[in-house]
Amino acid sequence: MDAQLNNLWEQALNIIKGEISEISFNTWIKSCTPISISDNILKLSVPNEFTKGILDTRYKDLLIQALKIVTSRKFKIEFYLESDLEEEKENEEKQKEEKKDNTNDVDGSIVVSDEMSATLNPKYTFQSFVIGNSNRFAHAASLAVAESPAKAYNPLFIYGGVGLGKTHLMHAIGHYILQENPKAKVVYVSSEKFTNELINAIKDDKNEEFRNKYRKVDVLLIDDIQFIAGKERTQEEFFHTFNALHEENKQIILSSDRPPKEIPTLEDRLRSRFEWGLIADIQPPDFETRMAILKKKADVEGLSVPNEVMVYIATKIKSNIRELEGALIRIIAYSSLTNRDVSVDLASEALKDIISNKESAPVTVKTIQESVANYYNLRIEDLKSQRRTRNIAYPRQIAMYLSRKLTDMSLPKIGEEFGGRDHTTVIHAYEKISENLKTDEGLQSMINDITKKLTQK
């Protein structure tokens, strides 16, 4: 933003600040970033479609009026989504790269740091990452890799559910490395984009340029690597890319929604390489972490939210960070649109659709038995029977473990639900599964899947 545009925008903000409530100003107006001003048109960047709609319908005239007071001219306001601007920037960079094709060095090497650092989200840094028990290990591993690329863990494989912070950590690694070494060649890309670029390279007979781009870097970060599974040519290309980088002692960081052994149709040779380094998982945040995330979000956005409202959100929204932050913004928006103070009652109204869906059915021993039996293709009667073959006994222990963890039922009562077993049997099952969870990633993934289905029905 140039100085003249910055000065004009700050003056307009000062005028608007006196016209609307603080919460409306912080929620809507401060979310805008001026891009350019020319021909009496001010272009503003906004974070999402929802914000764009609110600004367009409720605050556009106010912005125009403020600009008129500052400049004595009537401006038009145009809103652009940040995601669209990023895509446009990527396309421009791609066109520039194509124009440089004939002027590259003889060895075909290309400088990617400046170009690729533009694809890193500036908000995703280690400083803005909220650490809790659910992500402490993944955060520590990511920081270790950022501090000593290719010396700590190579590759680093981060896995976890949607919205838990995998992408945040990957961007944070990229930012940290570039901050310490601005000349480092850092590439961040989704597996989908990697695949699409490969397809285009094959189609346009530019395989060598594609390989130079991804094999002559210092750090390669690939998000959602699970999506290359089943794509034979992509797996072949990535296999050789992985080998080339690893042999040159370059850092590789991968993310996925599941551990390598759980990715179906992934070639064994890739699976084994993904397991060469360190595998770190991220679990759904616990209550304390959810509270910390909400407080951090409120501080960053300049929002005033009563503590009891944050407690309410953290108690009701348990699945992931994205939903937590979305719930907070929804409450603030509801407060602004209804011109009411933020309170627990207002929060309950704003989130009634979301929360009613999440609280529709309580978890019971019966629903746990149904889920486990369905997962293992058994009958509930099998779990209650006296049979002790491993294909039945182990699922039974898992069901007992989940029954103790997810319900308030006493141990003797749980035992009764499993064919009249003694409470010590339930304790043994719980302890055995708890111990196995420490080392068995497949079991961790399965328990998480079943728990998610049970708690989000």
Swiss-Prot record:
Region (Domain II): 75-118
Gene3D superfamilies, A to Z: 1.10.1750.10, 1.10.8.60, 3.30.300.180, P-loop containing nucleotide triphosphate hydrolases
Location of region: Disordered: 87-108
Residues reported to bind ATP: G163, G165, K166, T167
Keyword field: ATP-binding, Cytoplasm, DNA replication, DNA-binding, Lipid-binding, Nucleotide-binding
SUPFAM superfamilies from the UniProt entry: P-loop containing nucleoside triphosphate hydrolases, TrpR-like
Domain I, interacts with DnaA modulators, as annotated region: 1-75
Domain free text: Domain I is involved in oligomerization and binding regulators, domain II is flexibile and of varying length in different bacteria, domain III forms the AAA+ region, while domain IV binds dsDNA.
Name of this chain's protein: Chromosomal replication initiator protein DnaA
Gene: dnaA
